[in-house]
Amino acid sequence: EVPEPPVAVWYIIPSGTMFRRTIRPIVNKLLPRAEVRHWYGEHSSTQQNIISFRNGSELHFVSADMRQRRLQGASIHFAINDETPEEDIFEEVQARVLDTHGRMLVVFAPIDAKTFWVRDNLYMPYLNGERPDIDVIHMPVSDPVTGESLVPWFTKTDIERMELQWPDPQVRAARMYGEFITRSGVVFASFDKKTHCVRPF
């Protein structure tokens, strides 16, 4: 269900540097310029970027490394978290969409300890049927059976390179298939009880 404009949207990124290097060039390519009234901070490396549209809607690019209190007080309709935010930042942004009955989207690969709170507080309750308000979409880069790319701009050769780059099955599961992993047992990955254990003497 899409709300009627005007709406306020936050695109939350890990840092301003990531916005300048990665996000802004993509936005520049995809933005329907005819629908834009003004892009505040478009050519600035320090000013917060806000795109104001002709229908009154606004798209704010917000850095997750801002202090939590700087996120307080706003009322927004939709929030996109690009990569996993800290839990306190997520909770603050969640409070921003309450009064509009808005929604949040979190996009990430579960590759480090920073994602454990998402697994414990959101993903596992979703799997157990305790959070009907949550939807989970796995977006693997390739078919795990055929190895064929599921991403239009990746070739089968790209997929094979990724598999070489991440030979560890757990890392591959997280990076290529979006599966939560627990990095346990990696210190002695080749440990075999039959080979490495002896009876007490």
Regions found by a protein language model. Name each.
Residues 7-19:
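Conserved RecA-like ASCE P-loop NTPase motor core of nucleic-acid helicases/translocases
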Residues 146-201:
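ATPase catalytic-site recognition across NTP-hydrolyzing enzymes
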Residues 18-77:
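Inter-Walker segment of RecA-like/P-loop motor cores
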Residues 75-90:
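SF2 helicase catalytic motif II
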Residues 11, 78-81, 106:
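Short catalytic-loop micro-motif centered on adjacent basic/acidic residues
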Residues 1-5:
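Walker A/P-loop NTP-binding motif
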